[in-house]
């Protein structure tokens, strides 16, 4: 829980700044190059790129810097600084903050562009950087630009959030003649803004992409833009399995989800997004994966993607920083345009803080608009219908701040923890190139007591690799970075059996609590690491990495079975990342265990509907975009028959 702290005085600020600069130069120091290696690469420091000046330490990082300052960290020689950082990363109260700072520093060091749009380290990593320039202009959705410090708007329906769920509901209701206002916390991005730079990604993600569950147990990624996560996701379009749909019908009361009626919602979504496999081109990182699967006789399939027919795989690889081609059929290019044509309005840069309720019914929302120039305004939207579609983290937070939704708000959070195992191969993979995700295997889908994981390859870029590698010392980290071009990264995405929760801190902001405590989930985590390592070994990897701290690694010539046993026995908390936050305001028949009824309307407040992945009763067991959109369309149809008086 975040605590209120007194702002540091000038002397404390100066000491923190000096300590932070030395932390950065300890993480990325000047070291002697190995024989035959590029001298400038090994000599360059974080200070040479001004990394410390870019950082804005939060309270936890400030406490870490104060503790290091009390130890005289800034005046110690490099070996002592290195040993202290390594020790504190492994144990003690500051370990989560230090690991987070380490990832932030290393990620920035290998991604920060200069005035020419390039990073000085890229050439020595074999990384080409951007492969094309953005278009000079691109089509934009018209957005409201209200003036003054008090803004009042009215609508039939206020949709909070514009991602996979909110966009569908906005388009459907606007198409049926409702006055719809979409309120989005993020800004609008277009292909003209997408420079194919990792450094730009912070503005497209919730909390800049630097976000973890309490205690650093799992990293969290969620979109924050007009179009939500669909703007920056990897375009994986998978239908929910039949067994999931059957369970939602039988155990949670969503009877129609197991019928042909829901098939129609799925088909409509796929058609609007132009979901297809014809434009899927197997990416370099997928090649050793499918080779190993073939050798083991395990099935895999091409991933269906929401792309235009003119999608060019040669220009792909940067989807997580936006699609410069405009080929990705994200909701800002599909459903939000449909909504706009039907008269919907859009207000961006607005953080909704509370839902207005009177007499047990919705009356609108209040929030804060922050303009590009930094000026702010208090926004009040009067609307008898409110759709909460702010994502699996912010949707329950808004309900909690509003004091509505019942006892299940924030509970039952599923995160689809992804466990990464990477192989270093004797040839160049160049995993940053090609379409981000092109192949999936369901071979381990039910690996443990009805739970399991999907096997998928992912993209790899300097920032991501630098931030995830286990740091032992500055010289070793630089040596590992030099292997970047030969790395094939894969992950096992678990459909979690246990759950976490979303609560509020003292300032009313969302805090995610999650532990890898469920026995089934712990078994799946071990299986994911073991099976991915086996596949890398079969595919001919010379080294196999995980993201454990301290590291777990296998090198050619070592006993692989011993490595496999170590993976099986390891503690896997603190290792995974989550790009899918689900179920935290779920639908169901029982108000004690669900937030909304089986159609999506809150049990306790008329006119407030859940319209995003938070509404899912449990994990959908696959990448959730298509399921989210189909459920949203289903909810929109239910809303169309609803008559809520103003």
Where are these regions (language model features)?
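FAD cofactor-binding and catalytic pocket of flavoenzymes
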Residues: 2-3, 7-10, 233, 251, ...
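Flexible, low-complexity segments enriched for small/polar residues
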Residues: 5-110
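C-terminal lid/capping helical subdomain adjacent to the catalytic/cofactor pocket in oxidative enzymes
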Residues: 53-54, 123-151, 176, 403-404, ...
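Rossmann-like flavin
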Residues: 78-98, 226, 230-313, 492, ...
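Conserved redox-cofactor binding core of oxidoreductases
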Residues: 108-145, 255-354, 362, 543-574
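N-terminal Rossmann-like FAD-binding beta1-loop-alpha1 element of flavoenzymes
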Residues: 155-182
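Glycine-rich loop(s) and the adjacent beta-strand/alpha-helix scaffold that form part
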Residues: 172-181, 186-198, 219, 225, ...
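N-terminal FAD cofactor-binding segment of flavoenzymes
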Residues: 178, 185-243, 285-294
